[in-house]
């Protein structure tokens, strides 16, 4: 009887350990939120942010967890200096007053143990709004050099920038919808 109880206790402990979440740190050298936005209804402008940080708590068994990504808005990059300077200024991001965009959410709706949605809130320009992203892919491997779990994901969604007080160009016919893509990699913390 004692052996049976010991075996059951070990089995329960093992299943609890395998279901535990792992803490990951966003790899800023491999994480670049990018976006597409309308230009006067005649073309699409694309850009990205070069500086992001954050953390993920991920339970690979359940396919659930939490995510927090902080993006430095001054790192916006359109590939055109004049547009970058304007976007950082008071007429758009106003990075001196609102230096960061922050997304906080939870990984949900797993299929075969992999989440398919990231449901949360985006705070930008002093405004917080709900935002749901589709998780297009998520894969974890053993990092060959660091010998730790390393995960990469691609998520996408869209939002109305006017909802965040970023309405520049609206009077000229610019559409307010922004398509967002986040390519992110994160390393398990020791």
What are these regions (language model features)?
Residues 6-12:
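Hydrophobic helical h-region of N-terminal Sec-dependent signal peptides
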């Amino acid at each position: 009887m004692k052996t049976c109880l010991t075996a059951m206790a070990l089995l329960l402990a093992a299943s609890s350990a395998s279901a535990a979440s792992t803490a990951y740190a966003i790899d800023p050298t491999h994480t670049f939120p990018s976006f597409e936005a309308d230009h006067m209804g005649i073309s699409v402008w694309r850009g990205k942010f070069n500086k992001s940080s954050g953390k993920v708590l991920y339970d690979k068994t359940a396919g659930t967890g939490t995510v927090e990504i902080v993006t430095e808005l001054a790192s916006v990059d359109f590939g055109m200096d004049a547009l970058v300077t304007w976007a950082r200024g008071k007429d758009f991001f106003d990075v001196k007053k609102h230096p960061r965009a922050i997304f906080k959410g939870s990984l949900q709706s797993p299929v075969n143990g992999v989440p398919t949605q990231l449901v949360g809130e985006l705070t930008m320009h002093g405004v917080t709004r709900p935002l749901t992203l589709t998780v297009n892919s998520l894969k974890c491997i053993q990092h060959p050099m660091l010998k730790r779990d390393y995960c990469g994901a691609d998520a996408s969604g869209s939002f109305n920038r006017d909802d965040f007080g970023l309405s520049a160009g609206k009077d000229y016919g610019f559409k307010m919808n922004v398509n967002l893509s986040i390519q992110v990699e994160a390393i398990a913390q020791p």
